[in-house]
Protein backbone atom coordinates (compact mmCIF):
# COMPACT_ATOMS: atom_id res chain seq x y z
CA UNK A 1 0.00 0.00 0.00
CA UNK A 2 2.85 2.39 0.83
CA UNK A 3 4.48 1.68 -2.55
CA UNK A 4 1.25 2.43 -4.39
CA UNK A 5 0.80 5.67 -2.47
CA UNK A 6 4.44 6.62 -3.13
CA UNK A 7 4.13 6.00 -6.89
CA UNK A 8 0.83 7.86 -7.00
CA UNK A 9 2.40 10.88 -5.29
CA UNK A 10 5.38 10.78 -7.68
CA UNK A 11 3.02 10.65 -10.66
CA UNK A 12 1.01 13.61 -9.37
CA UNK A 13 4.15 15.70 -8.77
CA UNK A 14 5.51 14.89 -12.24
CA UNK A 15 2.17 15.66 -13.86
CA UNK A 16 1.87 19.02 -12.11
CA UNK A 17 5.46 19.89 -13.05
CA UNK A 18 4.86 19.01 -16.69
CA UNK A 19 1.70 21.10 -16.86
CA UNK A 20 2.99 23.97 -14.76
CA UNK A 21 4.69 25.85 -17.56
CA UNK A 22 3.69 25.66 -21.17
CA UNK A 23 4.80 27.91 -24.01
CA UNK A 24 2.56 27.85 -27.02
CA UNK A 25 2.60 29.90 -30.19
CA UNK A 26 -0.44 32.09 -30.73
CA UNK A 27 -1.48 34.76 -33.22
CA UNK A 28 -1.21 38.48 -32.65
CA UNK A 29 -5.01 38.60 -32.46
CA UNK A 30 -4.93 36.34 -29.40
CA UNK A 31 -2.92 38.89 -27.40
CA UNK A 32 -4.76 41.03 -24.86
CA UNK A 33 -6.09 44.24 -26.42
CA UNK A 34 -3.59 46.40 -24.51
CA UNK A 35 -0.69 44.45 -26.04
CA UNK A 36 -2.17 44.73 -29.53
CA UNK A 37 -2.55 48.49 -29.12
CA UNK A 38 1.02 48.78 -27.80
CA UNK A 39 2.42 46.93 -30.82
CA UNK A 40 0.37 49.05 -33.22
CA UNK A 41 1.53 52.26 -31.49
CA UNK A 42 5.25 51.55 -31.17
CA UNK A 43 6.12 48.77 -33.60
CA UNK A 44 3.67 49.00 -36.51
CA UNK A 45 6.59 49.24 -38.96
CA UNK A 46 8.13 45.93 -37.78
CA UNK A 47 7.33 42.41 -38.93
CA UNK A 48 6.26 39.96 -36.22
CA UNK A 49 7.92 36.54 -36.49
CA UNK A 50 6.63 34.87 -33.31
CA UNK A 51 3.97 35.45 -30.69
CA UNK A 52 3.81 33.04 -27.78
CA UNK A 53 1.86 32.66 -24.59
CA UNK A 54 3.59 31.27 -21.51
CA UNK A 55 1.20 29.84 -18.97
CA UNK A 56 2.59 29.13 -15.52
CA UNK A 57 0.61 27.82 -12.58
CA UNK A 58 -0.21 31.31 -11.31
CA UNK A 59 0.07 33.60 -14.34
CA UNK A 60 0.16 34.14 -18.08
CA UNK A 61 2.74 36.14 -19.96
CA UNK A 62 3.19 36.89 -23.63
CA UNK A 63 6.31 37.30 -25.76
CA UNK A 64 6.43 38.94 -29.17
CA UNK A 65 9.53 38.61 -31.35
CA UNK A 66 10.06 40.80 -34.40
CA UNK A 67 12.14 40.03 -37.51
CA UNK A 68 14.88 42.50 -36.50
CA UNK A 69 15.37 40.76 -33.14
CA UNK A 70 13.34 43.19 -31.05
CA UNK A 71 11.42 41.41 -28.28
CA UNK A 72 8.55 42.62 -26.13
CA UNK A 73 7.22 40.84 -23.06
CA UNK A 74 3.74 41.50 -21.70
CA UNK A 75 2.02 40.48 -18.48
CA UNK A 76 -1.35 38.73 -18.47
CA UNK A 77 -3.20 42.04 -18.80
CA UNK A 78 -1.21 42.99 -21.89
CA UNK A 79 0.95 45.63 -20.20
CA UNK A 80 4.57 45.60 -21.34
CA UNK A 81 7.15 44.42 -18.83
CA UNK A 82 10.27 44.32 -21.01
CA UNK A 83 11.39 45.66 -24.36
CA UNK A 84 14.77 44.73 -25.83
CA UNK A 85 16.34 45.49 -29.18
CA UNK A 86 19.19 43.87 -31.10
CA UNK A 87 19.65 46.94 -33.28
CA UNK A 88 18.56 50.48 -32.60
CA UNK A 89 17.04 51.81 -29.42
CA UNK A 90 13.96 51.30 -27.30
CA UNK A 91 11.27 53.86 -28.21
CA UNK A 92 11.93 56.96 -26.09
CA UNK A 93 8.27 57.28 -25.08
CA UNK A 94 8.61 54.06 -23.07
CA UNK A 95 11.34 55.50 -20.87
CA UNK A 96 10.18 57.65 -17.93
CA UNK A 97 11.22 61.29 -18.29
CA UNK A 98 13.40 61.28 -15.16
CA UNK A 99 15.37 58.29 -16.46
CA UNK A 100 15.74 59.82 -19.94
CA UNK A 101 17.04 63.05 -18.41
CA UNK A 102 19.51 61.19 -16.20
CA UNK A 103 20.87 59.10 -19.07
CA UNK A 104 21.18 62.01 -21.50
CA UNK A 105 23.06 63.98 -18.83
CA UNK A 106 25.38 61.26 -17.53
CA UNK A 107 25.67 58.95 -20.54
CA UNK A 108 25.34 61.25 -23.55
CA UNK A 109 25.50 59.39 -26.84
CA UNK A 110 24.36 56.07 -25.36
CA UNK A 111 21.08 54.51 -26.37
CA UNK A 112 18.77 52.32 -24.32
CA UNK A 113 18.70 48.85 -25.86
CA UNK A 114 16.62 47.17 -23.12
CA UNK A 115 14.13 48.36 -20.54
CA UNK A 116 12.40 46.21 -17.95
CA UNK A 117 9.83 47.46 -15.51
CA UNK A 118 8.82 45.85 -12.28
CA UNK A 119 6.64 47.11 -9.45
CA UNK A 120 9.28 49.06 -7.55
CA UNK A 121 12.06 49.50 -10.10
CA UNK A 122 13.00 49.97 -13.72
CA UNK A 123 16.13 48.46 -15.24
CA UNK A 124 17.71 49.75 -18.44
CA UNK A 125 20.64 48.45 -20.43
CA UNK A 126 22.66 50.98 -22.38
CA UNK A 127 24.43 50.45 -25.70
CA UNK A 128 27.78 50.49 -23.85
CA UNK A 129 26.69 47.43 -21.82
CA UNK A 130 25.97 49.19 -18.52
CA UNK A 131 22.82 48.12 -16.71
CA UNK A 132 21.23 50.84 -14.60
CA UNK A 133 18.51 50.24 -12.02
CA UNK A 134 16.17 53.03 -10.95
CA UNK A 135 13.59 53.09 -8.17
CA UNK A 136 9.96 53.97 -8.86
CA UNK A 137 10.80 57.68 -8.48
CA UNK A 138 13.49 57.51 -11.17
CA UNK A 139 16.43 57.68 -8.78
CA UNK A 140 19.47 55.57 -9.69
CA UNK A 141 19.92 52.75 -7.16
CA UNK A 142 22.37 50.38 -8.88
CA UNK A 143 24.86 50.10 -11.74
CA UNK A 144 26.01 46.76 -13.10
CA UNK A 145 28.72 46.25 -15.70
Predicted features by range, described:
Residues 23-145:
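Interaction-mediating elements
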Residues 1-25, 39:
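Bacterial Sec-dependent N-terminal signal peptides
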